[in-house]
Amino acid sequence: MIVFISLFTLFLTLLSILTNNVIVWWSIFLLMTVVFILLNKSSKSYTSIFNYFVIQESLGLLFLLCSGGLLQFFIILLKIGVAPLHFWIFNVTNNIFNYGLMWFLTFQKLPFLTILLQIFWLSSVYILLFGLLICYVQIFVMKSYKNLLIISSTESFNWIVLGVFFSMFNTFYLFIYYFVLMVLLISKFSKTSGYNFINWETTLVFLNIPFSVSFFVKIFSLSEIFKYDSFFTLFLLFTMFLSVLAFSFWLINLSMKNNEETSNNNKMNYFIIFPLMVISII
């Protein structure tokens, strides 16, 4: 089923690129909501399904009513959950686990991203950069492991959105690679796994260590954004220090405790991840 849904999502993404009809776009929004419901129905995440359905369909109707103009652009940003319009995400992710969470943070956003590209407003770069600043402040005050990962994923997706307007090919390549990484990391967020996701691999990846996927997302985006506004982007780089302090919360727990039962991981998967990080430079 997951293979069929993945292929169906790729088909909807291709369809959204080939057409600029608002009715077709709205139909894609509706079908992606159905996909989300199908994926999370088996885990009985009814609260998250209800919240997601109400939010997405309300915004979908507004998208139809407000045909043309900047309002449609902001509605798409809100539907995707791009910072600083990501405040509703936690109402959905609280009861989502395992691959449902992975799908929500990655592939679920792919058709929306291609539609956003077609109605992009150039001055929104400043809004996206401000959203990154909000993410860094939120990461600094977060104390939940799961919320830390969700905010970090939202922040990385903001960099992807910024990058797609400058280099679409590089961004889609990084998005697919980011998706593969999240498949291996977020699969630990299950109801029965406890804190298995608290490990050195997860922490180091989200600390933006060199050759990690989030590191490349930021480097490729920064190389283009510096041409647009160097001062504000440089200021953002200094504020990234807040995220390092926040993820040190993980580092302290990992250093002070020897949780052998919570350090189990798919070790072979990580032997695959890190060589791929180096290959992605090429």
Swiss-Prot record:
Transmembrane segments: 17-37, 58-78, 87-107, 115-135, 166-186, 202-222, 232-252
Family statement drawn from the similarity comment of this UniProt entry: Belongs to the complex I subunit 2 family.
Function of the protein: Core subunit of the mitochondrial membrane respiratory chain NADH dehydrogenase (Complex I) that is believed to belong to the minimal assembly required for catalysis. Complex I functions in the transfer of electrons from NADH to the respiratory chain. The immediate electron acceptor for the enzyme is believed to be ubiquinone.
Top enzyme category: translocase
A single GO molecular function term of this UniProt record: NADH dehydrogenase (ubiquinone) activity
Catalytic reaction annotation: a ubiquinone + NADH + 5 H(+)(in) = a ubiquinol + NAD(+) + 4 H(+)(out)
Source species: Caenorhabditis elegans
Keywords: Electron transport, Membrane, Mitochondrion, Mitochondrion inner membrane, NAD, Respiratory chain, Translocase, Transmembrane, Transmembrane helix, Transport, Ubiquinone
Effect the entry attributes to changing residue 66 to F: In strain: AB1, AB2, CB4852, CB4853, CB4854, CB4855, CB4857, CB4858, KR314 and PB306
Localization: Mitochondrion inner membrane
Protein name: NADH-ubiquinone oxidoreductase chain 2
UniProt topology in membrane: Multi-pass membrane protein
Keyword Iron: no
One record GO biological process: mitochondrial electron transport, NADH to ubiquinone
Example of a GO cellular component annotation carried by this entry: respiratory chain complex I
Highest taxon listed in the record's lineage: Eukaryota
E.C. number(s) listed in UniProt: 7.1.1.2
